[in-house]
């Protein structure tokens, strides 16, 4: 099954109101009369309203970088899934390695977030991946399976309908080089094959993204891989020209 490429731009703690306006005006023009790409922007939550103001195209979607598992209450600084849903957010990143590292988020925490997002029809972008380079494929596979299984046991394979899985090896994030295309395909194929044991049809419909030092120089080889359905971009997506160039490359590559 051919899946429409999904490009997610994670701004992290970057950006300003002017950049929001510039990028959205360019994106609206860029995606005019095009329906073969899905572009998702995850700005800092304070800029979500600015994005909503300028989004004109149906294939540009809003995402949040995080969510709390509580719906209301005395939880200073948090944002609930209800708030995101009411605001028109469609995707929410969970399990990002930076959240695990700097905020001590555990597999249990990520699973709770996954479940609450599903309850409110928000699409989880579930980030998984190994923390260290390892020549032992079995160790890497076990680490990935552990992250997936925790959720599978709670919600079953049906819970992965309308879910994005972003494979992001921690050792490749924010570095000069990404993982090699061959390696990325091997891991993506493993993830899809593993999920297919539970339900082959569902596994074919799950969007598998790669994240970790993706840029205009390496994106063509990455997106050309059979089981790569999109990319999770970081710093490269806040550079307007670089971001638009990456979209061009993905569009042309997936057309051919």
UniProtKB/Swiss-Prot annotation:
Keyword match Translocase: no
| Record's subunit section | Homodimer.
Q: Which CDD domains match?
A: TIM
Q: What is this protein called?
A: Triosephosphate isomerase
Whose protein is this, by species? Answer: Wigglesworthia glossinidia brevipalpis
Main localization, broad class:
cytoplasm
Q: Where does this protein hold substrate?
A: 10-12, 174, 213
GO biological process assignments: gluconeogenesis; glyceraldehyde-3-phosphate biosynthetic process; glycerol catabolic process; glycolytic process
Organism taxonomic ancestry: Bacteria, Pseudomonadati, Pseudomonadota, Gammaproteobacteria, Enterobacterales
Please name the catalytic residues of this protein.
Answer: 96 (electrophile), 168 (proton acceptor)
């Amino acid at each position: 099954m051919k899946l429409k490429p999904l490009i997610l731009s994670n701004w992290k703690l970057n950006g300003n109101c002017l950049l929001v306006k510039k990028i959205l005006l360019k994106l609206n023009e860029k995606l005019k009369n095009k329906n073969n790409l899905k572009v998702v922007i995850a700005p800092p939550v304070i800029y979500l309203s600015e994005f909503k103001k300028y989004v004109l195209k149906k294939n540009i979607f809003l995402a949040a970088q995080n969510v709390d598992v509580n719906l209301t209450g005395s939880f200073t600084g948090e944002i609930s899934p209800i708030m995101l849903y009411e605001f028109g957010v469609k995707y929410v990143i969970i399990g990002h390695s930076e959240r695990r590292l700097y905020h001590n988020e555990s597999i249990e925490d990520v699973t709770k977030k996954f479940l609450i997002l599903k309850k409110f029809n928000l699409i989880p972008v579930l980030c998984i991946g190994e923390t260290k380079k390892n020549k032992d494929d079995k160790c890497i596979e076990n680490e990935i399976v552990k992250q997936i299984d925790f959720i599978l046991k709670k919600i079953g394979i049906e819970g992965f309908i309308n879910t994005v899985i972003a494979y992001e090896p921690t050792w490749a994030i924010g570095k000069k080089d990404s993982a090699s295309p061959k390696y990325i395909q091997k891991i993506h194929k493993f993830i899809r094959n593993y999920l297919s044991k539970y339900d082959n049809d569902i596994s074919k419909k799950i969007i598998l993204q790669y994240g970790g030092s993706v840029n205009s120089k390496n994106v063509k080889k990455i997106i050309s891989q059979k089981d790569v359905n999109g990319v999770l971009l970081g710093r490269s997506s806040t550079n307007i020209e670089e971001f638009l160039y990456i979209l061009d490359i993905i569009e042309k590559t997936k057309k051919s």
